[in-house]
Amino acid sequence: MANLHQQQIIDKIQNITFKDGTFLNEVISDIIIKGNNIGFSIDISGKNKLEAEEIRLKAINKLNNIKEVNKITIVFTQSKTIDKKAQKPKHFVENVKKIILVASGKGGVGKSTISALIAQQLSLENYRVGIVDADIYGPSIPHIFGINGIPKTVEGRIVPILAQNIQIISIGFFVKAHSAIIYRGPMASKIIYQLLSNTRWNNLDYLIIDMPPGTGDIHLSIIENYHLDGVIVVTTQQKISEIDVIRSIDLYRKLGLPILGIIENMIYMLESDHCGYLSKKYHIPLIAQIPIMPQIANACDKSLPLTNLLTLPLEKYL
């Protein structure tokens, strides 16, 4: 008879999730294997106990399909909760109702284009919308909207530039074109604070934040310091893109930020096994699949509205 090993257990329960999107594999520990008997603990901190019991039974049913297993023991544990009084209070952005991040672990997947499209579409639907270009090292929003000016200041606060009826702020407004932007992490985080909190937003329904690639200081600074309503994840069909996006998904789940959906950008015309893969694997809604369209790049280069080319089913997800 073959020996049991931990990977068998993990593989069997990998698709079991809580209603909040947490995968069971993320909250189990202390896996013990003794002969044909197995056991582990589930951290149910912040979970509904009835739901946790349902999850436990699902896990037992899955594990009973391993022929070598004789006895299964699953216990519940709870990690120490953080004293809310000791938690750092999060900031609300003045005159902003909702803040949505547009993110991806990979650069070059079209986050800025998607951010612009979302903002333009919401504006056409009569919402008051703003964009923060949080890609400090590679700001693209000024180019997409054809903005060359420098924002004014009123009473020490930045007035966002209005383009296509959208209020926009970007570090790109304050540096020379094609100049390298060189900031260490703490300085980049301070700039983000200035762009978010020191801008005179005019009664926004939605503030879209075009995030930089990766999962670094800027991401942590925004997520840990501001009240956010969710994140839209952008990816492509390429495997290398998916690998980085998975890291982003892991970050947002660990930090408790709702993932509103996935947008697959620059989809090939041919069928691919990767279409919808992340949405299915991580149980995240697939908002849209956008094909490769030269017209989109042309519209961005000419600062034309992207809504002339396509729209997204945003009402279902925002």
UniProtKB/Swiss-Prot annotation:
Disulfide bonds: none annotated. One of its GO terms (biological process) is iron-sulfur cluster assembly. This is Iron-sulfur cluster carrier protein. SUPFAM superfamilies: P-loop containing nucleoside triphosphate hydrolases (SSF52540). Keywords: ATP-binding, Hydrolase, Iron, Iron-sulfur, Metal-binding, Nucleotide-binding. Binds and transfers iron-sulfur (Fe-S) clusters to target apoproteins. Can hydrolyze ATP. The keyword Coiled coil does not apply. GO terms for molecular function: 4 iron, 4 sulfur cluster binding; ATP binding; ATP hydrolysis activity; ATP-dependent FeS chaperone activity; metal ion binding. Homodimer. Belongs to the Mrp/NBP35 ATP-binding proteins family. It comes from the Bacteria. PANTHER family: IRON-SULFUR PROTEIN NUBPL. ATP binds at residues 105-112.
